[in-house]
Amino acid sequence: MEKKIVYRIFTIADYERETLYFREMHAKGWKLRKVNYSILLFAVKYTFEKCHPEQVSYQLDFYPMEKSERATYLQLFKDCVWEHITDFNSFSYFRKAHSEIESNAEFEIYNDAAGKLAMVNRILRLRLVPVLLLLAIHIPFLFKLLNRSNAYGLWSLLAVGLDIFLSLILLLIVSSIGWKLWHKKKELSDL
């Protein structure tokens, strides 16, 4: 079977854009097979397999769980004719052919605002808040090291300065993701 490997950058806030990308690829004759970390820093490795072009709905669900809950979780989606593709970074990837969709409500896993809002809240609580807490602890510590690095010479000053710079870049990226998720949460809360 012919394979295609694509490297893309999607943040956890871009899960809807990611599903649209998979839908477009499937319509061109490439179905998603696997999602992995890549050797590239921020990009994710997507493996596609050649298939007949068709209209397919892709959905992602962020639902970290115990292994004991996994079989029940997957069976729920199987009962609703959603094919489980793979799991990556606590996201489960599903697809369903449009020919198997009987109503508009079946195009999405969460077809109501409450379900979508619950998923966004899980992402915020389990992914974004821990990273922000670590950065909140790490950055002041680095500034304290910067004050002391003068005693250790130029190289330690440069190392601490670079660490501060990279931490601030990471803070900007995480803040941008948080901003997108916060707006998504607000939009869903208003429905």
Sequence positions of predicted segments:
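Terminus-proximal functional modules
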Residues: 1-191
